[in-house]
């Protein structure tokens, strides 16, 4: 093994691999898939490697063998603990011809060295926070919002006219150039007036109508209308209003509160107290996040570090993949998301890049705080956190451990402890 230090950011290791070692890994790679191999004339799982290679080629085996060799060498270097690396190493200077000819071959691994962080000040930071208070009007607004959800729609009397926030039930038929157009007709259509659900100007012209009334509504399709052939076209909608419904909000009483079936709440007074507590908890959470943001901003400002672009790119790719997973759960693609928000590729890339840089700055700085303060996480604390997660997600501890390796959990707890230390040592000024 040969070592070559490029600069303070990169270290390269070069290896010689014998044909014998390669053959061992090729055999191992084939043994892993042998039981699934099927070729006519041979029993499943009993196909000789030579026959497999003649039918399917050698590339898959060589790829798996090389991956095993790289992983072995990678672990050897990590165990030496000569330096701290970030991300996965890159394979360099691989002699593929010799590899595929089953000869002795060479390759290298290029590591990104963990950047050095210089912390100028991290204890005694000055942070500001608001006086936490929940006003009566905030409680009232929250309860009114809850009552809104319990509201029912009731029909207005014949003489009443259509007003803002009413729901209209009506028929309509649209005409462009005196001809009906596709999608321009509906029966007993329900529309909340003021919702902006219909074409601009339509709802405004319906205001004041009475049940049973007919009216022609004249509007122009927007220039960016999704049906291009209708864009900028003048349209007449012939409308017949059948019914006007208005929202009736229930009166706040103990009986209504009981019907809501809220935990530990059965009276108006209890609802008010519970709502006040919930709002206060929300403000505390928001305050905690704001303090965390202030601390991180000051730590970044008070630190010196240079993050290699390769690591930022790796983090950016990771963020993008995770974001795409989240979108997939909502049956969306990244392209659809960008179209929906009107964001171009360049802006999206820039946002991912900035977030990647922030994540790395935070991680490296907090890790340095933990190092300088000699913080450690005990086995007991790790096990307790596994139990907490198990109780929270209602799944067995073993399942949590399978999805969250101990090393990752330990690092997460260490980061939390280091950040808490900085926050607890900060000077808090209340506005």
Swiss-Prot record:
The keyword Hydrolase does not apply. Pfam families: FKBP_C (PF00254), Trigger_C (PF05698), Trigger_N (PF05697). Its main location: cytoplasm. PROSITE patterns: FKBP_PPIASE (PS50059). Residues 165-250 form the PPIase FKBP-type domain. Involved in protein export. Acts as a chaperone by maintaining the newly synthesized protein in an open conformation. Functions as a peptidyl-prolyl cis-trans isomerase. This is Trigger factor. It comes from Aster yellows witches'-broom phytoplasma (strain AYWB). The lineage of its organism: Bacteria, Bacillati, Mycoplasmatota, Mollicutes, Acholeplasmatales.
């Amino acid at each position: 093994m040969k070592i070559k230090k490029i600069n303070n950011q990169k270290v390269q290791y070069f290896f010689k691999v014998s044909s014998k070692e390669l053959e061992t890994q090729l055999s191992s790679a084939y043994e892993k898939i042998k039981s699934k191999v099927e070729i006519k004339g041979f029993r499943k799982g009993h196909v000789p490697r030579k026959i497999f290679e003649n039918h399917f080629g050698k590339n898959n085996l060589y790829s798996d063998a090389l991956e095993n060799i790289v992983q072995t060498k990678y672990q050897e270097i990590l165990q030496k603990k000569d330096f701290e690396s970030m991300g996965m190493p890159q394979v360099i200077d691989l002699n593929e011809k010799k590899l595929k000819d089953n000869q002795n071959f060479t390759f290298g691994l290029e590591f990104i060295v963990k950047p050095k962080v210089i912390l100028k000040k991290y204890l005694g930071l000055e942070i500001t926070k608001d006086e936490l208070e929940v006003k009566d009007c905030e409680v009232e607004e929250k309860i009114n919002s809850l009552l809104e959800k319990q509201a029912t729609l009731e029909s207005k009397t014949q003489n009443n006219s259509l007003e803002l926030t009413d729901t209209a039930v009506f028929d309509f038929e649209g005409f462009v150039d005196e001809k009906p157009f596709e999608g321009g007709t509906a029966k007993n259509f329900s529309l909340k007036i003021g919702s902006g659900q219909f074409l601009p100007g339509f709802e405004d012209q319906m205001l004041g109508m009475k049940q049973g009334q007919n009216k022609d509504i004249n509007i122009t399709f927007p220039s960016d209308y999704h049906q291009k052939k209708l864009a900028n076209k003048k349209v007449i909608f012939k409308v017949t209003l059948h019914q006007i419904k208005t929202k009736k909000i229930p009166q706040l009483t103990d009986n209504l509160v009981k019907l809501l079936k809220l935990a530990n709440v059965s009276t108006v007074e209890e609802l008010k107290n519970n709502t006040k507590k919930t709002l206060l908890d929300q403000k505390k959470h928001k305050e905690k996040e704001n303090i965390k943001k202030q601390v991180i901003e000051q730590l970044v400002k008070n630190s010196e570090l240079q993050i290699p672009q390769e690591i930022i790119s790796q983090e950016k790719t990771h963020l993008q993949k995770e974001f795409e997973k989240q979108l997939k759960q909502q049956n969306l693609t990244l392209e659809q998301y960008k179209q929906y928000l009107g964001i171009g590729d360049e802006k999206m890339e820039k946002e991912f890049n900035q977030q990647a840089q922030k994540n790395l700055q935070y991680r490296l700085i907090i890790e340095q705080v933990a190092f300088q303060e000699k913080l450690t996480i005990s086995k007991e604390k790790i096990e307790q956190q596994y139990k907490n997660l198990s109780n929270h997600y209602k799944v067995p501890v073993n399942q949590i451990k399978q999805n969250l390796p101990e090393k990752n959990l330990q690092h997460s707890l260490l980061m939390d402890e280091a950040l808490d230390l900085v926050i607890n040592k900060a000077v808090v000024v209340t506005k």
